[in-house]
């Protein structure tokens, strides 16, 4: 039964790829270019970009105080610091996402278009590692689910819109994280509404900033 439901859900994608022959999975991110397998299979690109996108969609939970984190606790954990920094440095060495591809997430675009470098983006990546680790640490299955999200991106490009509003839905459903549902009120809804209005505005001006 589950297999049947999955086949129904995937049917539009199969129709799009095989019948309409719009096979974006095996096309270069740059029009007229060739697929670069070093980029296609570079999961550090996906880890860095998707981590910052996941952080972006967690921000309204923090701003509305539906969820709280204690970064000081993470910073004081020596073994955790060592593991995250080693992961970050390895990823930093292999990261080669091309700004000409487009996408990369809002923080990647801000870093490139406003600061003209990737320093801000790398800073957000590192902060993302700490925050995501803390919110996922409540249950090991959270890490596995996040790994599946990363592996699900099988093409060269990584667009912010791929995860909108999927990440917020996952935070509220499949992820087991510390969210205080009792604090849902009009103020909370206003924060989420403002968040999405800001997001739509950024989508609108992304080609001009």
Task: State each model region's role.
Residues 161-167, 171-175, 188-204:
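C-terminal transmembrane-bundle signature of multipass membrane proteins
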Residues 142, 162-163, 208-209:
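Extracytoplasmic loop-helix module adjacent to an early transmembrane segment
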Residues 86-147:
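Flexible internal linker/loop segments at domain or repeat junctions
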Residues 1, 60-75, 130-139, 174-191:
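Membrane-interface junctions at the ends of membrane-embedded or membrane-associated helices
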Residues 40-60, 106-131, 158-177:
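Hydrophobic/aromatic-rich transmembrane helices and adjacent perimembrane loops
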Residues 6, 75-88, 139-150, 180-202:
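Signature aromatic-anchored transmembrane alpha helix within multi-pass, membrane-resident enzymes
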Residues 152-157:
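C-terminal, well-structured subdomains that either form a transmembrane helix-short loop-helix hairpin
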């Amino acid at each position: 039964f589950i297999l049947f439901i999955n086949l129904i859900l995937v049917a539009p994608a199969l129709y799009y790829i095989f019948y309409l022959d719009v096979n974006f999975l095996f096309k270069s991110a740059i029009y007229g270019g060739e697929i670069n397998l070093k980029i296609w299979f570079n999961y550090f690109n996906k880890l860095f970009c998707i981590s910052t996108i996941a952080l972006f969609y967690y921000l309204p939970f923090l701003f509305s105080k539906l969820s709280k984190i204690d970064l000081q606790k993470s910073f004081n954990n020596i073994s955790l610091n060592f593991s995250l920094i080693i992961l970050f440095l390895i990823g930093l060495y292999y990261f080669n996402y091309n700004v000409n591809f487009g996408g990369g997430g809002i923080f990647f675009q801000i870093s490139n278009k406003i600061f003209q470098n990737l320093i801000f983006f790398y800073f957000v990546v590192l902060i993302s590692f700490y925050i995501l680790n803390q919110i996922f640490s409540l249950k090991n299955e959270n890490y596995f689910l996040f790994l599946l999200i990363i592996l699900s991106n099988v093409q060269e490009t990584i667009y912010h819109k791929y995860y909108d509003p999927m990440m917020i839905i996952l935070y509220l459903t499949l992820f087991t994280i510390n969210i205080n549902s009792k604090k849902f009120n009009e103020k909370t809804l206003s924060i989420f509404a403002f968040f999405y209005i800001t997001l739509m505005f950024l989508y609108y001006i992304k080609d001009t900033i």
